């Protein structure tokens, strides 16, 4: 008997497969009877979608479909189903795949498992390459045309891009024409996207957002959910090796709706066998918090032995933030401050509530120019002047951090020629990977951290800065923000035959740094779970994406014990940042406060400083003081987002603390007040002690309340910032 579809179920999830080629035609949550795979993307094959290089030309690698199979029966896959009592397994063997529709000698085996009573489906892929062509990347599993419920516009997609990106109506949003503006600062032309983060349209008409892990992608999962339906779809790869991968979301747009979700692997396989690690597609109730909880548990079961459990110094835990000075030597040799200015800059920071300075542009040829020439610039003063200034700050209980770029090598300096040739990441065609920042003609080679001599030099340079110059923290720019790359350099023996070893190089760097200077906390740009538990703080830079759905709560909730740092910006005199960013100055400040971020306060003379914006400086000073009181009295706490908060605005967040919870509240001027109360679900005691602090009054106001009907109601004072500690009695 002919069956057009093959069915697999465990009573929780059902999967429907095309009986001819094994593609997924149905992905169903049985409790709602909703098939999420509602639209078949005709021109974009599902289940497996890769790139293979044939005669050095990139071609789409897919499973064969009816037109190819009808012409060549040897392409017919063998599909085996095992339907048990409350469980099921499918195995699909493809003797050949197709590259741009043409048969290629690459076989694939797909295995799908549904375990009893489990909302998670497990997916596995193995490849055998006999073609002699390189399989560079492979998206698996790839399910297309997804939406939940009746209306795709009511769906929301969570992508952990730089801590988190929330995208309503992803079908429409991914296909929107990008709205871009340019802001000029010095010789930098900063591009900002407004309204949505743009996707890239490929030759099949697919709008795709692809983010590498590491490099933009903070965690290896996505979640598509519908608040109207109360359900969601979660996708991840349980990546035990933490190798370079990517997540991607795609659509054909609102006139051909639905979203595709996939995990990108990078086999870089020219011959032989390759196997994926376990991937998961799951249905769940509720919103993205289920997905974050699920991912956290899986990562805790698979800790990174290189980067996990790095102790953060007590001084850093008690510090509210730092003041960042990029205005020593700018690109092109423009000098604002010298080493003799450091004591005065520290005193100014102290007046704002900070005792931690970050200094960039301290090195030969300055910021965004003299990389990696990491010795103090003699144009800024003597080494002794620098040492003395730092020693005096430390004697006062302060701290100094130096900016170091972990990625770039200026190709314009003759002394960098050998480093460039030896350590630069190389494209597949043998060309060097080159990047540009700032002025036209200032070009940088992208250095491969899996090249040992570069890693050794960087560790030695930072060790010198700690042991000789006296800094007690270091910031590694671009480490987890700039995209990871594939390196095909034939002389990089440490990762020979493995172009996708980017993450492993940085794991080794951080491990070697901690061994060399264990007393020096590490901060870096970007945010990624591969390295995050092994550093003091991760810079998320919401300031660059305030208008495109940036949502740092996603990472903070998933890994609440890790410290995020975020940039603050004055309302006026914001030459460094665009006007639409400056208009969100207070929102950025208060958002950083309620999610417990380590403040990153710029102080660039005339270009970006709170000291010329007196009213906003006073607002920041009060916020920093309240944050300091929070840390001194309760510590960081464990971030729980809006858990158990039945009535609360966007800028109200909950933390677990010893013997109770802490609630951080903010009201941003210019935004509508979201009510006068916060209602907390409480079943821990019949009475509670409430301790309140505000930005205007750091003296605790304490009262005791009876718990009524399992709830605690907090009346918000007429103030912009407040903290409530609710503790059991």
Q: Where are the language model's segments positioned?
A:
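Acidic-aromatic substrate-binding/catalytic surfaces of carbohydrate-active enzymes
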Residues: 2-99, 111, 151, 163-165
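Beta-strand-rich recognition/accessory modules
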Residues: 7-9, 188-313, 339, 577-586, ...
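Acidic (Asp/Glu-rich), glycine- and aromatic
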Residues: 102-104, 117-191
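Carbohydrate-binding surface patches
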Residues: 216-221, 643-686, 690-693, 697, ...
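Aromatic-lined carbohydrate-binding/catalytic grooves of carbohydrate-active enzymes
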Residues: 320-460, 467-473, 479-492
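Glycan-recognition surfaces
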Residues: 415-444, 450-453, 503-614
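Aromatic- and carboxylate-lined catalytic core of secreted/periplasmic carbohydrate-active enzymes
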Residues: 589-664
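C-terminal beta-strand-rich structural cap/linker in extracellular carbohydrate-active enzymes
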Residues: 706-729
């Amino acid at each position: 008997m002919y069956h057009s579809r093959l069915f697999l179920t465990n009573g929780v999830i059902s999967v429907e497969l095309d009986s001819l080629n094994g593609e997924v035609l149905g992905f169903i949550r049985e409790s709602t009877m909703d098939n999420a795979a509602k639209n078949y993307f005709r021109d974009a094959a599902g289940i497996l979608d890769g790139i293979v290089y044939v005669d050095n030309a990139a071609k789409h690698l897919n499973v064969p479909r009816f037109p190819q199979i009808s012409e060549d029966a040897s392409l017919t896959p063998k599909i085996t189903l095992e339907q048990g009592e409350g469980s099921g397994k499918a195995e699909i063997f493809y003797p050949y795949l197709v590259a741009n529709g043409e048969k290629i000698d690459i076989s694939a085996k797909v295995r799908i498992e549904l375990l009893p009573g489990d909302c998670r489906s497990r997916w596995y892929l193995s490849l055998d390459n006999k073609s002699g062509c390189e399989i560079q990347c492979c998206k698996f599993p790839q399910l297309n045309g997804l939406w939940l419920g009746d209306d795709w516009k009511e769906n929301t997609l969570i992508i952990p891009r730089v801590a988190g990106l929330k995208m309503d109506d992803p079908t429409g949003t991914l296909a929107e024409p990008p709205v871009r503006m340019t802001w000029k600062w010095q010789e930098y032309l900063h591009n900002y996207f407004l309204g949505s983060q743009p996707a890239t349209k490929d030759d099949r008409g697919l709008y795709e957002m692809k983010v590498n892990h590491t490099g933009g992608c903070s965690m290896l999962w996505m979640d598509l959910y519908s608040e109207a339906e109360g359900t969601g779809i979660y996708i991840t790869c349980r990546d035990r090796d933490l190798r370079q991968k990517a997540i991607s979301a795609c659509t054909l747009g609102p006139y051909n709706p639905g979203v595709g979700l996939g995990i990108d692997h990078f086999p870089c396989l020219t011959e032989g066998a390759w196997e994926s690690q376990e991937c998961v597609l799951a249905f769940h109730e509720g919103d993205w918090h289920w997905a974050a909880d699920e991912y956290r548990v899986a990562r805790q079961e698979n800790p990174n032995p290189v980067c996990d459990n790095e102790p953060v110094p007590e001084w850093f835990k008690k510090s509210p933030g730092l003041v960042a000075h990029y205005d020593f030597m700018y690109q092109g040799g423009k000098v604002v401050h010298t080493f003799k200015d450091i004591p005065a800059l520290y005193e100014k920071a102290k007046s704002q509530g900070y005792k931690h300075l970050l200094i960039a542009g301290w090195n030969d040829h300055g910021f965004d120019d003299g990389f990696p020439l990491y010795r103090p610039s003699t144009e800024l003063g003597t080494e002794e002047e620098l040492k003395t200034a730092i020693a005096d700050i430390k004697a006062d209980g302060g701290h100094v951090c130096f900016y170091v770029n972990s990625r770039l090598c200026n190709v314009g300096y003759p002394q960098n020629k050998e480093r460039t040739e030896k350590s630069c990441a190389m494209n597949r065609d043998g060309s060097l990977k080159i990047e540009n920042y700032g002025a036209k003609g200032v070009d940088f080679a992208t250095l491969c951290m899996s090249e040992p001599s570069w890693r050794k030099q960087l560790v030695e340079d930072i060790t010198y800065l700690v042991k000789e110059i006296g800094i007690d923290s270091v910031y590694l720019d671009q480490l987890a923000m700039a995209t990871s790359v594939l390196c095909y350099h034939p002389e990089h023996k440490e990762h020979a035959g493995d172009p996708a070893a980017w993450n492993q190089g940085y794991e080794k760097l951080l491990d070697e740094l901690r061994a060399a200077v264990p007393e020096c906390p590490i901060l870096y740009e970007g945010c990624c779970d591969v390295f995050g538990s092994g550093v003091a703080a991760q810079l998320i830079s919401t300031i660059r994406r305030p208008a495109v759905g940036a949502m740092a709560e996603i990472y903070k909730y998933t890994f609440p014990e890790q410290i995020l740092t975020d940039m603050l910006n004055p309302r006026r005199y914001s030459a460094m940042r665009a006007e639409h960013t400056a208009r969100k100055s207070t929102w950025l400040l208060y958002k950083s406060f309620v999610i417990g971020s380590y403040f990153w306060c710029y102080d660039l003379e005339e270009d970006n400083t709170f000291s010329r914006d007196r009213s906003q400086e006073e607002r920041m000073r009060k916020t920093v003081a309240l944050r300091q009181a929070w840390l001194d009295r309760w510590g960081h706490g464990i971030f729980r987002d809006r858990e158990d908060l039945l009535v609360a605005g966007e800028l109200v967040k909950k933390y677990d603390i010893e013997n109770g919870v802490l609630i951080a509240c903010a009201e941003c001027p210019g935004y509508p007040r979201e009510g006068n109360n916060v209602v907390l679900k409480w079943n821990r005691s019949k009475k509670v002690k409430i301790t309140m602090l505000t930005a205007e009054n750091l003296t605790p106001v304490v009262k005791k309340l009876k718990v009524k009907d399992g709830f605690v109601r907090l009346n918000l004072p007429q103030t912009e910032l407040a903290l409530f500690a609710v503790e059991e009695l």
